[in-house]
Amino acid sequence: MGLAELRDRFPVLDTCLVQVQALLDPRRVLLAPEDQALHLAWRTQDRLEMATIDLPPDLCRSGQPLNHQVLGETIADLLLEKGFSLPQVDIELLLPLSSCEWRLLEGAAATALSCGDDLRVLQPELGWSLSLQDCYLDILTLQQSDSALVVGTERQLLQAWVDTLQEADLPLRRAEWLLSAAWRGLFDVHAGADQRLVWLVEQQGRWRLLLLRNGFPE
């Protein structure tokens, strides 16, 4: 009995085959949302592909989803339009520029940080609007450096994106701030360079200027 005949007799096999295919060949897709648009990026065999869809004003505001179901369906529809099988997709979320804050920490205490709880114990004065106890923290440390970057975002905002992707039955592989992801790439390109760099970042028609010394923002 051939596979086609088995699938005709036992339709549940289609679901099983899709699940097996998702495990054997997951597709990594970057999702970079803005208030006005969604951006997707993924790699094929020979190049990087991208897709963008405009959003109505009532779906996302200040980086936070307002309608989980509709926004989730919009993401799923765009993936299907680009030929993806949803069970195969692993989403890597790049949080919008306006949704996070970061600070540079220096010294022995900074290099000893391994997670957000370590920072909460120290209770440093970071001078940002987030509460250390109520936000999600990511610590970015680098080898052969006495500095670390701490990135924070509201737990409510991150959970809203988790809920949105769940509405579309899409697994969230990881989440990272768009700016820190871009910074890591820039740091790798200029690794070991003892110089200062001026980094211009466009944000909703406005420019953000960052000064980098030895790879770290001043």
Segments (PLM) and residue ranges:
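N-terminal glycine/serine-rich phosphate-binding loop of ATP-dependent small-molecule kinases
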Residues: 81-91
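Internal amphipathic helical hairpin motif
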Residues: 57, 68-69, 83-84, 95-149
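N-terminal phosphate-binding loop and adjacent alpha-helix
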Residues: 50-82
